[in-house]
Amino acid sequence: MRKGWIIMKAVLQVVSHASVRVDGELTGQIGPGLLVFLGVAEEDEQADLDKIVKKVTELRIFKDDAGKTNLSLQDVNGELLVVSQFTLLADCKKGRRPSFVKAGNPQKAEEMYEEFIRVCKEKVPKVEHGVFGADMKVELLNDGPFTIVLDSKEL
């Protein structure tokens, strides 16, 4: 275990639809599926990414015909929108201003973000995404709401 460090985090939201824009231009849009906000930490490795991808694609959080959350994103042929969000790695222990020193350096974080998208595309038919490091406007219609927070060190 990497002592004292936050590891890759993802916030999953079941959505009826979601989209992301950069400078007013649509960069990603999905119908029913998952919106994933992804935060990459400094010490993240491929194993962390693989654990998060597996949960995102296989977690049974969609309703079956009986209304029970029993189906995965893959089972329902859901769509996926991935948005980078380093603020998930905020450390708010001291003072009133969050620290982001545990977030991955931008080059490494972008590589991991792109790899996350690539691996998801192998498992999910439609994967859309935002622009790494950009100021984005995200619109979504939550379904539920149903929100899950994943931390790779806890998987």
What residue spans do the PLM features occupy?
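Compact, glycine-rich, soluble single-domain proteins
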Residues: 26-77, 88-118, 128
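Short, Lys/Arg-enriched N-terminal segments with co-localized hydrophobic residues
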Residues: 1-7
